[in-house]
């Protein structure tokens, strides 16, 4: 880059020389070199302004000939510099005489290389250029070279300082005399450091203004009291307190550092002799053999000027800022964020340091003395130093000695046009030459909408405390003011003002959802069998309150199943006979009988009207009636014969006459069969499963051995078992050598989820732009030729480099504005409004947006091993988890869901999830979520430059000296609050998964799940001394022929910690419950297919088995539900294949009524009464209608 700058600047100078040549054919050679690297863009733009041929033919080192354009010449220049062995490049247009030749020479001393540029042009072509054209070409070229930011140290006039030019701190005796004042030839470390590249870009852009030290010596800025703090004795000193809130960096070998303090005065910190400041400028370090620099290091990037603008009544506000450094701007009671930030500041007359929310600068050129630099030559004839010199050097000249127009002066001066318009320029031999200093005009900043002239303006990196204007997303908190009621028709949740849109209720691993139009009350179905069994029910609600969502735990007491399921007309209400009274049962029979009679009557009438053999239709009915009568008579006769036979046998009746004598002797007869035939025909065996799935470890994987009274079994192999439904258990039974040696491995299905498998994701947040602007006149700073029109977004103006060096998202603009005297410029060409805009995060939190590429089923299992240890694991399809006894894997046969591509999801880490009603976009698009997206949460918080942005997000409105920048971004936090889960879309409810670890979907689906248990030489010990226990049956609640099952509760009293196992007589049913010291109630889920349960178990804790009777009545819950409801329920695991069965139900009905004969008689009685009542009502209705008809007829006649 260093050599490339030399090439470009040499070409420009060479071009200028050729243009002013009028010879027919001239060959000019120029040499150039530089010791500093340089960005080439500005010089290249000027090079393209030269009227070069559109098409060039270039020969690189004479090796190859390439065709290129002037636009591509830049690449060719880079090639000759970078490539080894390429020593020259020659380009010419269609006319071979129009040629540019660049020759790369060998390195020489400190110079990287020597470049010779040759340009040949025809005299006629040169002659077409006017002097005005020549001037417009040469001046921009010189401006590029002279005003490039990196060559400040080579511009001798930068050391021609305004005012006294003193750059030293009083009391520093070792300060070199060259700082009192700064001279052209002398070295002053306090000033020279300001010209180093990249360190103080703001001052370098306004280098002809005063430094802080110069402003102090020119009495523009006062000194602090005390003016300097010794770090070794500065404990508790106020100046040290201000220094500590600044983030600073001091180079090595500096003994002192200075800054502008909060009072608008200069303060400094210093170390004793032979000590240097450490890199953080907070400590002193002694270095042996090192020579300390004789100067003070500036801790802020600033410049100063003289001003009379009063700032005593000036009040500024920084949006959302509570404190900057030691200055408290406002009182903040909420949460604060603290960070080091680059903050602009200014100092006015009679004011303290004023921090600014943004910095808008404008410069007005003027003819004041500080706007000119005057110099003379050392050794100049009749100069102040006219003695002979060994070096060619310049010397500053006091402009006050030059006469103003209409005034008097002691010296004769000459200068440029600007100087001669304000001062008398002599036509004779002058004492000094004066010229206008570029960028030396009056600088004004905008404060509270008013342009004011500050004494000093600059940047510093300081601690800033900001209030979190937008409240962070709150975690899901319990709703302490909500009210819950366990109503018969459902669980009612009432809020205290916010409107609930959807909710999820869960109990015992079973969840149900509900959605509605936003209301302060929502009614949810009871999950599982919680309506009758009672217990805690967790409810998660989505609402329109400030918080994302709320949760509440409702406790419902156990209730009589017949009271909570009291529907008479619905299906489950009709078949729950145990819940009917005599009146309700009669109503049911009457309704069905009436419907049957009406249907038969209608059918008869229709057939009769159509004359379709009504008599023949009645014949089957008559035959059926006759057959029923015959069966009835036979049954009555048989019963009567049996009764008479019994009476005769006991002597109550003899030939139909009552015998009053001694009773006849009772003969021996066989037992009377009674109703055994009917019972055998109608007997149906019930089925139950305590451990929903139970297998016994086979001998192929079990090896047992006995050691005294103890038995040790080793398991090695694989066992396959079906997973239990939600709330139920799958058990592996391990039997020892003895009958009383039994242990179980239980896997309880705690919950089932249909979880989201995430695809692509990104992080986003809320951002706002902040823009800085500065207007510079044409040919001042970087405003030259067409630089403004060709300004690139990634190119930062030098005066904003101190802010632009951060890694935040930023862009740069340049807008051409008016020029001339009316706009404060000498040059009539357009001025340049340079803009630096950066984005900052509004909230100190970020959101993650993701999509779901698939929905997979996942089970949460609670594993109780053989020793009673409990652990909880999550298993997905085809996944495995390792345990202390081996591993367990899950195989699933299930269907997922579809239709989720039309929306995406948002996660607030640790706080919740939300749904977005738009598909996931892979690229940022304006007007959609994710206009700004980052790859990490920290990148969002810092608004890092690595984040992707949609184009043209920031809108600009330039207004001559200032600019407005605005954005219209989608706020993801508003979207998050509006779509916080749970939400219902496409008849599916989406909610946060268990533990808030993802998103799950509720759909009325089921899954077939199998568990594979793999044992790896696991040993199980059966201890000889067993624990004794007693168990008593408490209750049986729940449903039959349902997936929820029934809950069997036992009261267990044990002498220690162990387990209770129970089985029925044939060993087909097992109950396994833990036992603890003392008395404790334990419950387990079982599944039955009959409403009447009466099962005898044998239980044991120590091998001594005792009987246990489990008895109760269950009800049916919604066996037929064809209603379409939005939302859904949690996935059913291994649904029970046996549905509601009529024969099982009728068997329970007969048991309920006391036997089959009594059941048939009661049914017949109810049917007969219903038919009689029906015809009675028909008769009464017909009679009443007839009387009414007759009365109406008589009245009409």
UniProtKB/Swiss-Prot annotation:
Gene: GP
Protein name: Envelopment polyprotein
Record carries keyword Transmembrane: yes
Native organism: Rift valley fever virus (strain ZH-548 M12) (RVFV)
Transmembrane segments: 583-603, 1160-1180
Residues on Cytoplasmic side: 17-130, 604-673, 1181-1197
Similarity comment text for this entry: Belongs to the phlebovirus envelope glycoprotein family.
Residues linked to a glycan: 794, 1035, 1077
GO terms classed as biological process: entry receptor-mediated virion attachment to host cell; fusion of virus membrane with host endosome membrane; symbiont entry into host cell; symbiont-mediated perturbation of host apoptosis; symbiont-mediated suppression of host apoptosis
UniProt KW Membrane keyword: yes
Matching Gene3D superfamilies: 2.60.40.3770, 2.60.98.50
A Pfam family that the UniProt record links to this protein: Phlebovirus_NSM
């Amino acid at each position: 880059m260093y050599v490339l700058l030399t090439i470009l600047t040499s070409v420009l100078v060479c071009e200028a020389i050729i243009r002013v040549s009028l010879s027919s054919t001239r060959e000019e050679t120029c040499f150039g070199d530089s010791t500093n690297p340089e960005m080439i863009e500005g010089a290249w733009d000027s090079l393209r302004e030269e009227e070069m041929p559109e098409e060039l033919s270039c020969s690189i080192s004479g090796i190859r000939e390439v065709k290129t354009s002037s636009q591509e010449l830049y690449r060719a220049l880079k090639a000759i510099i970078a490539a080894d062995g390429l020593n020259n490049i020659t380009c010419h247009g269609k006319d071979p005489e129009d040629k540019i030749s660049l020759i790369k020479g060998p390195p020489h001393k400190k110079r990287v290389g020597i470049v010779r540029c040759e340009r040949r042009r025809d005299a006629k072509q040169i002659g077409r250029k006017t002097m005005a054209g020549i001037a417009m070409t040469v001046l921009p070229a010189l401006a590029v070279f002279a005003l490039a930011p990196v060559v400040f140290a080579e511009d001798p006039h930068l050391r021609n300082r305004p005012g006294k030019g003193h750059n030293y701190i009083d009391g520093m005796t070792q300060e070199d005399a060259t700082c009192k004042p700064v001279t052209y030839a002398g070295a002053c470390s306090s000033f020279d450091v300001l010209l180093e590249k990249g360190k103080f870009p703001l001052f370098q852009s306004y280098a002809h203004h005063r430094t802080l030290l110069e402003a102090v010596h020119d009495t523009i800025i006062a000194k602090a009291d005390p003016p300097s703090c010794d770090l070794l004795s500065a404990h508790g000193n106020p100046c040290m307190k201000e220094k500590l809130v600044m983030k600073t960096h001091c180079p090595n070998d500096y003994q002192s550092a200075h800054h502008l303090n909060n009072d608008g005065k200069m303060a400094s910190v210093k170390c004793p002799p032979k000590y240097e400041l450490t890199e953080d400028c907070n400590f002193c370090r002694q270095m042996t053999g090192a020579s300390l620099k004789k100067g003070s290091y500036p801790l802020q990037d600033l410049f100063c000027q003289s001003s009379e603008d009063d700032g005593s009544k000036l009040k500024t506000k920084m949006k959302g800022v509570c404190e900057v450094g030691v200055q408290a701007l406002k009182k903040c009671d909420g949460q604060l964020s603290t960070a080091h930030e680059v903050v602009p500041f200014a100092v006015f007359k009679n004011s303290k340091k004023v921090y600014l929310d943004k910095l808008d600068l404008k410069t007005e050129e003027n003819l004041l003395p500080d706007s000119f630099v005057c110099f003379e030559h050392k050794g100049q004839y009749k100069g102040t130093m006219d003695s002979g010199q060994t070096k060619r050097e310049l010397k500053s000249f006091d402009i006050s000695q030059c006469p103003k127009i209409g005034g008097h002066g002691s010296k004769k001066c000459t200068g440029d046009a600007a100087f001669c318009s304000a001062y008398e320029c002599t036509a004779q031999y002058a004492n000094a030459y004066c010229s206008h200093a570029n960028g030396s005009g009056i600088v004004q900043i905008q404060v509270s909408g008013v342009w004011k002239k500050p004494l000093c303006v600059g940047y510093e990196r300081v601690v800033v405390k900001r209030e979190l204007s937008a409240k962070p997303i709150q975690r899901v908190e319990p709703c302490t003011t909500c009210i819950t009621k366990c109503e018969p028709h459902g669980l009612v949740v009432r809020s205290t003002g916010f409107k609930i849109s959807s909710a999820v209720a869960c109990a015992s691993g079973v969840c149900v959802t509900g959605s509605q139009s936003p209301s302060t009350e929502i009614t949810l179905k009871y999950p599982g069998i919680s309506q009758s069994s009672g217990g805690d029910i967790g409810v998660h609600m989505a609402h329109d309150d400030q918080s994302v969502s709320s949760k509440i735990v409702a406790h419902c007491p156990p209730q009589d199943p017949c009271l909570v399921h009291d529907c008479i007309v619905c299906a489950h209400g009709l078949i729950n006979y145990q819940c009917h009274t005599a009146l309700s049962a009669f109503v049911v029979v009457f309704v069905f009988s009436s419907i049957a009679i009406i249907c038969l009557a209608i059918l008869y009438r229709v057939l009769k009207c159509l004359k379709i053999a009504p008599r023949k239709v009645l014949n089957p009915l008559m035959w059926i009636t006759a057959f029923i009568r015959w069966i009835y008579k036979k049954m009555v006769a048989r019963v009567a014969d049996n009764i008479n036979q019994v009476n005769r046998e006991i002597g109550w009746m003899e030939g139909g006459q009552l015998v009053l004598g001694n009773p006849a002797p009772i003969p021996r007869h066989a037992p009377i069969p009674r109703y055994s035939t009917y019972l055998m025909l109608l007997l149906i065996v019930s089925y139950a499963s305590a451990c929903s799935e139970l297998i016994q470890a086979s001998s192929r994987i079990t090896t047992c051995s006995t050691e005294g009274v103890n038995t040790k079994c080793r398991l090695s192999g694989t066992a396959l078992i079906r997973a239990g439904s939600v709330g139920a258990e799958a058990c592996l039974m391990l039997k020892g050598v003895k009958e009383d040696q039994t242990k179980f491995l239980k896997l309880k299905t705690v919950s089932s989820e249909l979880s989201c498998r995430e695809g692509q994701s990104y992080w986003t947040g809320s951002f706002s732009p902040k823009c800085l602007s500065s207007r510079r006149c044409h040919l001042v700073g970087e405003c030259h030729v067409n630089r403004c029109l060709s300004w690139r977004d990634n190119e930062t103006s030098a005066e904003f480099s101190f802010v632009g060096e951060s890694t935040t998202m930023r862009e740069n603009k340049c807008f051409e504005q008016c020029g001339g005297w009316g706009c404060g410029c000498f040059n009539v060409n357009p001025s340049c409004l340079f803009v630096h805009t950066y984005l900052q995060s509004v909230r100190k939190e970020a959101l993650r947006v993701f999509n779901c590429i698939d929905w997979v089923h996942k089970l949460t299992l609670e594993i109780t091993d053989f020793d009673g240890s409990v652990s909880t694991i999550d298993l997905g399809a085809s996944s495995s988890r390792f345990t202390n006894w081996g591993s367990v894997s899950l195989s699933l046969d299930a269907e997922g869901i579809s239709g989720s591509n039309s929306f995406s999801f948002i996660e607030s880490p640790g706080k919740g999830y939300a749904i977005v009603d738009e598909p996931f976009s892979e690229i940022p698009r304006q007007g959609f979520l994710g206009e700004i997206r980052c790859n990490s949460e920290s990148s969002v918080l810092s608004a890092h430059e690595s984040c992707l942005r949609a184009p043209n997000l920031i809108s600009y409105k330039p207004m001559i000296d200032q600019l407005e920048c605005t954005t219209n971004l989608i706020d993801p936090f508003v979207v998050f609050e509006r779509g916080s889960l749970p939400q219902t879309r496409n008849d599916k409810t989406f909610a946060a998964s268990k533990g808030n670890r993802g998103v799950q979907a509720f759909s009325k689906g089921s899954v077939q799940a199998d568990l594979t248990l793999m044992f790896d030489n696991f040993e199980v010990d059966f201890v000889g001394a067993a624990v004794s226990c007693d168990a008593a049956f408490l209750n049986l609640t729940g449903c039959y022929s349902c997936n929820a099952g029934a809950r069997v509760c036992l009261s267990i009293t044990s002498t220690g910690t162990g387990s209770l196992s129970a089985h029925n007589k044939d060993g087909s049913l097992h109950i396994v419950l833990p036992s603890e010291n003392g008395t404790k109630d334990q419950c387990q889920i079982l599944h039955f297919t009959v409403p009447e349960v009466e099962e005898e178990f044998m239980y044991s804790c120590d091998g001594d088995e005792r009987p246990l009777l489990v008895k109760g009545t269950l009800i049916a819950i919604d066996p037929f539900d064809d209603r379409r409801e939005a939302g859904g329920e949690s996935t059913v695991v291994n649904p029970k294949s046996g549905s509601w069965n009529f024969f099982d139900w009728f068997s329970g009905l007969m048991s309920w009524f006391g036997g089959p004969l009594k059941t048939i008689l009661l049914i017949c009685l109810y049917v007969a009464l219903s038919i009689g009542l029906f015809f009675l009502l028909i008769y009464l209705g017909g009679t009443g209608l007839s009387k009414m008809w007759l009365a109406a007829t008589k009245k009409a006649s």
